[in-house]
Amino acid sequence: MTVAGIPCAWWLVPEAGRHERLSRWIGTLAALHGGPVFEPHLTLALSTLPERVDVPDVRARLAAAVAVPGRTGAADEGLQSLTLNTVGLGHDPHFFRAFHLRMAPSQVERQTLAALVRVLHGVLGPAWDTRPPAFAPHVSLAYGEWTEERRRQQVRDTPIDPELARIRFDTLVGVRPRAGARTLDRVADWEIFLRLPLSQG
């Protein structure tokens, strides 16, 4: 049985070097614009949180689904790390996509993203209702209610770190509302309940 309206998000988080660079960038923009600070991530999937989740059991089942290099079929069937190209900066009127790095997954990489969601759905089961997000892959750099001109100006004024032309995502993270909250509408209500290193891919 699920609790209607209690969401869960599944993130792909960058490897340590890119994570550090993106975290500094996010922190700088948050200080400049008064927005929240958050962990750099790409949203892989959204779920509905079942009642009385046994987190250690969920983590163990997901860990068992991590692809093992060299095992037949592992690259197609298991959870694995993924490297994506970025194609510049983007902006959107949505609070959580106000300013972001746009990703450019190839057809094969899109298939890999879809396969990762399928693995999650298969491991978690139907009660979680795991599904891909309705928005394009991206890594947010700032959240906020920005005017269009402000967003455009930020894109014009922001140099892109060449080290972020390609980003490897090597960790799966589960996020749910903290105790007492029922939505993920506020960053302050986010609680990371699971962090799982993925295969080398």
Where are these regions (language model features)?
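Extracellular/lumenal ectodomain signal focusing on beta-strand-rich modules
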Residues: 86-88, 100, 171
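Basic, often amphipathic N-terminal segments
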Residues: 1-85, 106-168, 181-201
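Short, basic/glycine-rich phosphate-binding loops at helix/coil junctions
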Residues: 90-102
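Hydrophobic/anchoring residues in structured secondary elements
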Residues: 89-91, 174-177
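Short beta-strand element of the conserved SAM-dependent methyltransferase core
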Residues: 12, 101-104, 174
